Regions:
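Generic detection of long, well-ordered alpha-helical segments
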Residues: 1-4, 100, 150, 154, ...
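Gly/Gly-Pro- and Ser/Thr-rich, intrinsically disordered tail segments characteristic of DNA damage-repair
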Residues: 1-129, 302, 307-311
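Basic, nucleic-acid-binding surfaces and adjacent catalytic neighborhoods in DNA/RNA-processing proteins
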Residues: 22-41, 54, 88, 159-311
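Short, glycine- and charge-enriched coil/turn segments that flank and shape catalytic ligand pockets
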Residues: 40-44, 65-67, 86, 137-138, ...
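Short clusters of hydrophobic/aromatic residues that line enzyme substrate/ligand-binding pockets
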Residues: 45, 143-146, 199, 238
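A generic structural signal for well-ordered coil/turn residues at beta-strand boundaries
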Residues: 56-58, 104-106, 142, 258, ...
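A broadly conserved detector of short glycine/acidic/proline-rich loop/turn motifs that flank catalytic sites
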Residues: 66, 76, 114, 124, ...
Length: 311
């Protein structure tokens, strides 16, 4: 599933193409993928202009001048593909990104007044697109539960500490994967952030020091921003319509590098299973806690490797 940087990349790509466009037709072949009644679509979608594209957690929100919004969750295999003055798309890498559309994976289509089109494709039909009154978007159960946005100024060490309090007996990796703790974090960026923070993923939340939490807050922000600058990182299951893959993983610290030398100390990276997920660590830079009450942490600081932006 795409994580925050991949969805942010989609948001930025869409913003350049569809803002100010007028929607003239909207079709869907699957009510689960686009669960709105025809009368809702006719009243609030047809004839509407797009005024903004934004992101909350892993969800895209397309705001309309009718005070309604299209809320889009790509889930595992979703795609958004634009065909018009230029072709663009992002999502699960199959032929639908570059082939003729609509095809058998297309479950919704928007057509604009200039003849351009936006297709919502989803091979496994887990993703969805919903039309809602804009004031109701933040009241969706998903948004009511999701944690704070990590790239905002409001996301501080104090906020992270408060969000983790109810998970004091959980392993830190499990707590960070919980979307009610922090929005948009997934397996890749949790592993990377914990490595930079010198925290073993099996450390209990209640055993973390204030210094560790401060480092973790900053490194979550840093890793996510580096990945956005690199165009994302889900190279196996997330590409754009030109076949470009986010290149964050080319310079990843630990994720996907089992058996390779740590970029800092040279020790082979190990792969464990924590919280039911494959987990990558350096056993020297991230020593396992001696006991659940006394986690071990090195005192030396880490100077992160610079990730290169996509050229």
């Amino acid at each position: 599933m795409p994580e925050l940087p991949e969805v942010e990349t989609v948001k930025r790509g869409l913003s350049k193409l569809i803002i100010h466009k007028k929607i003239t037709t909207a079709t869907s072949d699957n009510f689960k993928s686009f669960p709105n009644l025809p009368e809702e679509i006719e009243a609030f979608l047809l004839g509407a202009r797009i005024i903004s594209v934004r992101r909350r957690a892993k969800v895209i929100i397309i705001d309309l001048d009718t005070n309604y919004s299209l809320v889009v969750h790509l889930k595992m295999t979703g795609q958004l593909v634009y065909r018009g003055e230029e072709n663009w798309g992002a999502g699960h890498p199959n032929d639908s990104l570059i082939g003729d559309l609509p095809d058998k994976t297309t479950h919704a289509k928007l057509e604009f007044s200039d003849g351009s089109k936006l297709f919502f494709n989803d091979q496994r039909k887990f993703g969805w697109m919903k039309l809602l009154a804009t004031p109701l978007v933040e009241k969706l159960p998903f948004f009511q539960k999701v944690g704070p946005e990590p790239l905002t100024e409001q996301f501080t060490t104090e906020v992270l500490t408060q969000r983790l309090q109810r998970r004091s007996k959980s392993r830190i990796k499990a707590a960070l994967l919980d979307q009610t703790t922090v929005a948009g974090l997934g397996n890749i960026y949790v592993d990377e952030s914990l490595f930079l923070s010198q925290i073993h993923p099996e450390t209990l939340v209640g055993d973390l020091t204030s210094e560790q939490l401060e480092r973790l807050t900053g490194n979550i922000k840093q890793v996510l921003q580096q990945s956005i600058d690199a165009g994302g990182s889900s190279s196996r299951n997330y590409v754009d319509a030109d076949g470009n893959r986010g290149n964050y993983l080319d310079g990843a610290y630990v994720y996907g590098r089992a058996g390779l030398p740590c970029r800092l100390c040279g020790t082979p990276i190990e792969k464990l299973k924590v919280a039911g997920r494959g987990t990558h660590i350096c056993p020297i830079c991230q020593p396992a806690p001696a006991t659940t009450n006394q986690p071990t942490a090195k005192s030396t600081s880490i100077t992160p490797k610079t990730h290169h932006k996509r050229g």
